Swiss-Prot record:
Family assignment from sequence similarity: Belongs to the UPF0181 family.
InterPro entries assigned: UPF0181
Compositionally biased intervals (Basic and acidic residues): 9-21
The name this protein goes by in its record: UPF0181 protein YE1782
Domain of life the protein comes from: Bacteria
Organism the protein comes from: Yersinia enterocolitica serotype O:8 / biotype 1B (strain NCTC 13174 / 8081)
Length: 85
């Protein structure tokens, strides 16, 4: 799965491409058409157990870096490097 999109069969991929081309032939920009078809696909696969959540950067804004550390190990910039001159 890429970018939060469920895995699609070849037939589903072809249908998506055809929908995108249809929207574009009606005057919609390629970006808008792709976004619309992607939203439709996500909606159809909303309860799909194979669909994986993709997190936005803002999901982690409430946490400090220390929230993600597993131990008290020093940061790399705190370790003395014997090879530095």
């Amino acid at each position: 799965m890429l970018a939060g999109m469920p895995s699609l069969s070849h037939e589903e991929q072809q249908e998506a491409v055809e929908r995108i081309h249809q929207f574009m032939s009606e005057g919609m920009s390629s970006g808008e058409a792709i976004a619309l078809v992607a939203a439709e696909i996500r909606e159809r696969h909303q309860n799909d157990p194979q669909a994986m959540a993709i997190f936005e950067d803002t999901d982690f804004d409430e946490h400090d870096e220390s929230d993600y550390r597993r131990d008290n190990e020093q940061d790399a910039d705190e370790i003395e490097d014997p090879y530095e001159g």
